Design a protein with these regions (language model features):
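Conserved acetyl-CoA-binding loop-helix of GNAT-fold acetyltransferases
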Residues: 73, 87-95, 100-116, 142
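Short proline/glycine-enriched turn/loop segments at secondary-structure junctions
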Residues: 79-81, 141-146
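Conserved catalytic-core motifs of GNAT/GCN5-like acyltransferases
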Residues: 127, 144-158
Length: 158
């Protein structure tokens, strides 16, 4: 999945390939927490990963209710948010360049829709997106998005 991530985002000016240490860190820190229903993976006929998407239930309300603390009883709010939540966060999508603009995104969204319908999710929030990443902007154009978070990179030659 991480190699596909590198391949997908390598043309963005601010992207830096993920190191093996970072890969190990992310696996240890996050993979145990993610509900497998919220991860969509698509493989080709030879079982090579060609696309993936990662979403998760939103924990914003759980954080608010627990005032940002897990102990002594904040964990209850997180468990409830994991089980019953009408909001989700869209964290990451990666599609191999050879499969972009070939309908793979439609397959991913169909599978995400099935998961959201089963779990009762009605609202989706995305992470901030780079203004220069036109592919991600085009991805949301049919959904009447409200863009209230974006990332911009400034550089200066010294």
């Amino acid at each position: 999945m991480f190699k596909l991530l590198d391949e997908t985002y390598k043309n963005l000016s601010t992207y830096t390939p993920i190191s093996d240490e970072q890969i190990q860190h992310y696996k240890e820190k996050y993979f145990g927490l993610i509900d497998k229903d919220y991860i969509i993976c698509i493989v080709d006929s030879e079982y090579n990963l060609v696309a993936f998407a990662i979403t998760m239930p939103s924990y914003s309300r759980a954080l608010q209710k627990s005032k940002g603390k897990l102990l002594p009883f904040g964990w209850v709010h997180f468990m409830n948010a994991s089980r019953k939540n009408d909001r989700a966060n869209f964290y990451l999508i990666g599609i191999h360049p050879d499969y972009q603009r070939r309908g793979v995104t439609a397959i991913i969204f169909k599978e995400i829709w099935k998961t959201f319908k089963k779990k009762g999710v009605k609202f989706l929030e995305t992470n901030p997106e780079l203004e220069e990443n036109k592919n991600i902007q085009l991805l949301w154009q049919d959904y009447n998005p409200v863009n209230h978070k974006r990332r911009r990179t400034y550089s200066l030659d010294v």
